[in-house]
Amino acid sequence: MLLGLGIVVLIYSLIALSVSLTTPNGAFSGLGDWLKHKKLGWFFGVLNLLIALGVAGIINGFVMWTGKLTQSLIKSGELWVPDKCKLCLNKPKPVVGLIHAGILMVLTTVALSSLGGLLYLPKVNASYDGKGFKSMGCLLEFADLIATWTSVGIFWFLGLVLLGGLLQIKKPKRWYFRTTGWLAVVVIGLTTLVVMVQPFVDLGIAVFNRSYERIVANTILIAILVIIVLVMFFPTEPIKLRLWRKRIQAMEACGEDCDACVEY
């Protein structure tokens, strides 16, 4: 797995470096124009095909583990399903997990696509500035925004996990573990902090300049950030404790060992 990730990172780093060196504005389409000028337009098609294969591999990996992961979350009480569905969790195929994940993804995609395409006001998008394409430009920039915030949240988790390991391990097996670990924590913390502070600064500048579109865009951006932080870091233990107390009270109300009150 580590070897595969390393190869993918190397390939995408080479693509990003090529785009930066061959185009004045850093746009991927500019690389295609440069290759056409050099009579290498076919290579741009091959490059797009390889990117599509990489995306298909990511989707395939996601589909392979999402069902089992969802079912493990259901078993631990992190996700809710009807009691009858819990009887099917131990079957070889994770059907319950796939259905649950599919419903969540469809609802989330519809909600976020509607919000991004109808309400988000991005900067000028040269690729979608024609009549009828404004919603698509808004949706693409909003999708990029969601991907950015999700990546920030993932890096925050990685930094917290690494910080927890540094605090828990008293005598590491390798002498360089603490140095490299603290360096990684500092770099992750500073970079993600800059990304999270930027929209607040942009909102202040937009308010000062009385730019309505930028005020709306940055407000939505900050709202999405707050929602993601709440979803990822909100403690679920108080909710579990409250549900458990209600369950105990229901069992006491109908008598001990009451099968009708026992939930799977």
Swiss-Prot record:
TM helices/strands, residue ranges: 1-21, 43-63, 95-115, 146-166, 181-201, 215-235
Predominant place of localization: membrane
Membrane topology note: Multi-pass membrane protein
InterPro entries: AA/rel_permease1
Membrane found in the keyword field: yes
Localization (cell): Cell membrane
Gene Ontology terms for molecular function: transmembrane transporter activity
Pfam families the UniProt entry points to: AA_permease_2 (PF13520)
Keywords noted in UniProt: Cell membrane, Membrane, Transmembrane, Transmembrane helix
Domain of life from the UniProt record: Bacteria
GO cellular component: plasma membrane
Keyword presence, Signal: no
Family assignment from sequence similarity: To M.pneumoniae MPN_308 C-terminal region.
The protein's name in its UniProt record: Uncharacterized protein MPN_096
Organism for this UniProt entry: Mycoplasma pneumoniae (strain ATCC 29342 / M129 / Subtype 1)
